[in-house]
Design a protein with these regions (language model features):
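N-terminal Rossmann NAD(P)H-binding glycine-rich loop of SDR-like oxidoreductase domains
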Residues: 5-25
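NAD(P)-cofactor binding segment of oxidoreductase domains
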Residues: 70, 81-110, 147
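Flexible, glycine-rich beta-alpha linker
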Residues: 119-120, 158-176
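Active-site Tyr-X1-5-Lys
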Residues: 134-158
């Protein structure tokens, strides 16, 4: 018996890769709900053009599909907003989703996507509810998580916080690093390299699939970071990329005045 999976926001970078990953498995029927058309027309997936901020159309679509599983990826993810209202997909869209869930009789599990930017860079949260955003986008994702916690689904559920995910079909801001490398415009600064948690999208969608199809009912372990381990040393990674491109990264020394 096949299972129906809805990817809300399946036309985006992670969503596109997740749909391709799921379609390689048997007994899965995949549906993409997104305001934007899919980047790839994949055999076996079904696209529905829906604005998740419009409750009635979102409700009708999900009710018609009657999914067994949902992965919610839809969001505004850039940092250019001037107010929280600019991130309505991350707030109102999630509120609408939570309103619809009780009407889905076959739903077994939902995974809702947040962001590591619910905490500023370098801040280590003490628990699942410890937030320290430094951007409006991060604040909007705090709202995402709070909406989910305050309207906990009756089925199993989990929240994921992707780190710096890269790979096929990715865009700003993480593509910028690769574009600078290919243009020979990246330089090592000073004598000390930093580390950052990146995640290859192929690994990320595998992690999402594992969370989706495994039990996460422990209320103390509802939030999962998506990314590769261990963290990546930026200098080492830049050197590896430069080697593949056939050149050597130059180092700029700091001048102390």
């Amino acid at each position: 018996m096949s299972h129906r999976i809805v990817i809300v926001g399946g036309s985006g970078f992670i969503g596109t890769n997740l749909i391709l990953f799921l379609l390689r498995q048997k007994d899965l029927e995949v549906f993409n709900i997104d305001i934007n058309p899919p980047r790839l027309r994949s055999k076996g997936s079904h696209y529905h053009s829906i604005d998740i901020c419009h409750l009635s159309s979102f409700y009708s679509c999900l009710l018609e599909i009657s999914p067994d599983y949902i992965v919610h990826l839809a969001a505004r993810t850039d940092l250019g907003g001037n107010s929280l209202d600019d991130y309505s997909a991350n707030t109102l869209g999630v509120e609408n989703l939570m309103k619809i869930l009780p009407s889905l009789p076959n739903l077994k599990k939902i995974v809702i996507t947040s962001s590591m930017l619910v905490c500023r860079t370098g801040y280590y949260p003490k628990n699942q509810f410890d937030y320290a955003p430094s951007t409006l986008y991060g604040e909007s994702k705090v709202k995402t998580e709070e909406i989910v916690w305050h309207n906990s689904p009756q089925c199993d559920w989990a929240i994921i916080r992707p780190t710096s995910i890269w790979g096929p079909w990715f865009g700003v801001p993480y593509r910028n690093f690769f574009d600078m490398m290919m243009a020979h415009r990246y330089f090592h600064i000073g004598c000390k390299g930093c580390t950052k948690t990146y995640g290859y999208v192929g690994n990320a969608v595998y992690q999402i699939e594992q969370i989706l199809f495994n039990d996460t009912r422990d209320e103390n372990q509802k939030v999962f970071y998506i990314g590769d381990n261990p963290p990546t040393n930026i200098e080492d990674w830049a050197n590896e990329i430069a080697d593949e491109l056939g050149y050597k990264v130059q180092r700029l020394s700091l001048i102390h005045i």
